[in-house]
From Swiss-Prot:
This is UPF0134 protein MPN_104. InterPro entries: DUF16. Belongs to the UPF0134 family.
Length: 104
């Protein structure tokens, strides 16, 4: 680029400068568009992560509820096992009485 007293030496020099400015302008425009697209992608990813976070929280609540149900079932099973033991003892007692009656 040749500039003499604030003026370009030739129209060709001016054209080269204008072409460079046009290229830079287009580059900035393209980069600006890319930044907008990337910004939208980041927003979408953020929304997705937030939704997944909510889903995880819901699953944690479900898992906690299932854990409570399992505890209740274990308590019921233990109680049923104790009841069965009592029934078995009662049956053993009845069997002994029957055996005693039969042996007499």
């Amino acid at each position: 680029m040749v500039e003499l007293d604030g003026k370009f030496a030739t129209k060709a020099d001016l054209k080269r400068v204008e072409d460079k400015v046009d290229v830079l302008f287009e580059l900035q425009k393209t980069q600006g568009e890319q930044i907008k697209v990337q910004g939208k992608q980041i927003e979408q990813l953020t929304e997705t992560v937030q939704k997944q976070g909510e889903q995880i929280k819901e699953l944690q609540v479900q898992v906690k509820a299932q854990g409570e149900e399992i505890k209740e079932i274990k308590v019921e099973q233990k109680a049923q096992g104790q009841t069965l033991q009592l029934i078995l003892k009662a049956l053993e007692g009845i069997n002994k009485r029957l055996d005693n009656l039969e042996s007499k």
